[in-house]
């Protein structure tokens, strides 16, 4: 085997390893977690009384936002009709268009889990994380 053949073989092997490394790094970047850093919030000062049936509507509406926003163009509005005289819960969720569907869902799951700590029992709230946003109210918007 000549020196030039050995060089071409090493060069081809190096190129192949470089391409494989780039693919692996690219795949890792695609699987990165969404940015869930807190950005801002606006919480209604009125609180939902403990045991109020509005909580049931609100929880169902937030679950709907979490489940469907990523598959509805990253901007989804919904409502949950009041049962037993409870007010209807209205909501909207938005994810940055630059993130993946799975990152959108993950960001909203994170936000739904944190929203009560940010806007404790508020009848309306707007909370923004870096990659996603949720608004909910007792009135249509």
From Swiss-Prot:
Key words, A-Z: Antibiotic, Antimicrobial, Disulfide bond, Fungicide, Lectin, Mannose-binding, Plant defense, Signal
BP GO annotations: defense response to bacterium; defense response to fungus; killing of cells of another organism
InterPro entries, per database record: Cell2Cell_Antifungal, GNK2, GNK2_sf
Residues that, per the record, bind alpha-D-mannopyranose: 44, 126, 137
Residue ranges annotated for the Gnk2-homologous domain, each copy included: 36-141
Disulfide bonds: 43-119, 95-104, 107-132
Leader sequence segment: 1-32
GO MF entry, a single one: D-mannose binding
A matching Pfam family: Stress-antifung
Function: Exerts antifungal activity through its carbohydrate-binding specificity.
Name of the protein in its database record: Antifungal protein ginkbilobin-like protein 1
